[in-house]
Amino acid sequence: GDGTGPGPGP
């Protein structure tokens, strides 16, 4: 992920 919002992931 990009470091925004909730939840798992990169």
From Swiss-Prot:
Top EC class of this enzyme: hydrolase
One cellular-component annotation, GO: extracellular region
Keywords: Antimicrobial, Carbohydrate metabolism, Chitin degradation, Fungicide, Glycosidase, Hydrolase, Polysaccharide degradation, Secreted
pH dependence statement: Optimum pH is 5 at 37 degrees Celsius. Retains >80% activity after incubation at pH 3-10 for 1 hour.
UniProt record, GO biological process: chitin catabolic process; defense response to fungus; killing of cells of another organism; polysaccharide catabolic process
Disulfide bonds listed in the record: none
Function: Has antifungal activity. Inhibits mycelial growth of wood rotting fungi P.chrysosporium MTCC 787, S.commune ITCC 3751, G.trabeum MTCC 355, P.agaricans ITCC 761, C.versicolor MTCC 138, P.versicolor ITCC 13, P.placenta MTCC 144 and P.friabilis ITCC 335.
Protein name according to UniProt: Chitinase
Lineage, highest ranks first: Bacteria, Bacillati, Actinomycetota, Actinomycetes, Kitasatosporales
